[in-house]
Amino acid sequence: MENWDLSSDEMQDGNAPELDVIEEHNPVTRDDENANPEEVVGDTRSPVQNILGKFEGDINKRLHIKRKRMETYIKDSFKDSNVKLEQLWKTNKQERKKINNKFCEQYITTFQKFDMDVQKFNEEQEKSVNNYQKEQQALKLSKCSQSQTLEAIKDMHENYMEGLMNLETNNYNMLFDVDGELRKEMSVFKKDLMKHTLKYSSSFPSSD
């Protein structure tokens, strides 16, 4: 009997720490026995709500970072498009100036030749005042030269207008390409935004 009592005491002493641990994890006093069950459930629910709150805050932070990145991407895309448009406008201006200078020089050269022909005709006319045949020949040559000069001016004008038309066509094609690239970039951005929106919206727990 004494041995049995001793073992019983050892068992009681061995269970004592376990009871202390249980009481530490479940600090319920006798006063808590009369506590409202809803308050007890509320206490156990608070840590879960805190975890869900932290999880929701982390998702919102990530979404905010994604939105900032998307805004930076849009700004960079529009900046690149503006640079391309400015470069296109500068190139157009340079090409137009080059065409104007080219045909301006040709016009000046042609009119200078025309003036020289008129001056030569006047000189020949003065020399051939007393020679009717020479005068007729000089007149014929002058008319032929003037006709050729006018024809050359007409051809140059047509070439000038054709050059301007080709320049406008090329500029339109380049603008169309820039617009196409911008639309393509916006389409990619829209798909990426929808993908990330669906991804993070599915991460939230259902309200049901």
Curated annotation (Swiss-Prot):
Tissue specificity note: Expressed in lymphoid cells.
Residue spans crossing the bilayer: none
Keyword Coiled coil in record: yes
Region (Disordered): 1-43
Coiled coil segments of this chain: 122-143
UniProt keyword annotations, A-Z: Coiled coil
Pfam families recorded: Cor1 (PF04803)
Basic and acidic residues composition bias: residue spans: 22-33
Superkingdom of this protein's organism: Eukaryota
Protein family according to the UniProt entry: Belongs to the XLR/SYCP3 family.
Name used for this protein in its record: X-linked lymphocyte-regulated protein PM1
Species name: Mus musculus (Mouse)
Originating gene: Xlr
